[in-house]
Amino acid sequence: MTKLKCKSLRGEKKDALQKKLDEQKTELATLRVSKVTGGAASKLSKIRVVRKNIARLLTVINQTQKQELRKFYADHKYKPIDLRLKKTRAIRRRLTAHELSLRSAKQQAKSRNQAVRKFAVKA
């Protein structure tokens, strides 16, 4: 089997990709059997290519699946954790802008009753 190109795989349907994946897996199994039974050197070098092809297929399948999920959850309020933006732990725990702007009743009364002082500089 020749090396698969991710560019050509991206346009294909999910079931076609799954079929190709199954073919690659069966080919890998036959190559491994031939390795144990003492197959030709050309078949042994093919194992690496087939393994990489399987990895490429799985990568394309997973990426398209995640892309579809991102489209689905785009207009939802809550998203699954793996689809959210990756932030640092500290940023995730930080107060939101709304939480920062909240004031207690006592603070609101103080700001209402006491005007902001204006200072003039004597020249």
Curated annotation (Swiss-Prot):
Check the record and name the SUPFAM superfamilies matching this protein: Ribosomal protein L29 (L29p) (SSF46561)
Q: Name one GO cellular component term.
A: cytosolic large ribosomal subunit
Reply yes or no: does the keyword Ribonucleoprotein apply. yes
Checking PROSITE patterns in the record gives:
RIBOSOMAL_L29
**What are the alphabetically sorted keywords of the record?**
Ribonucleoprotein, Ribosomal protein
Q: GO biological process: any one? A: translation
A single MF term (Gene Ontology): structural constituent of ribosome
Q: Do the record's keywords include ATP-binding?
A: no
What does the similarity note say?
Belongs to the universal ribosomal protein uL29 family.
Query: PANTHER family given for it?
Result: 60S RIBOSOMAL PROTEIN L35 (PTHR45722), LARGE RIBOSOMAL SUBUNIT PROTEIN UL29-RELATED (PTHR45722:SF2)
The record ties this protein, via NCBIfam families, to: L29 (TIGR00012)
| Identification of the protein by name | Large ribosomal subunit protein uL29
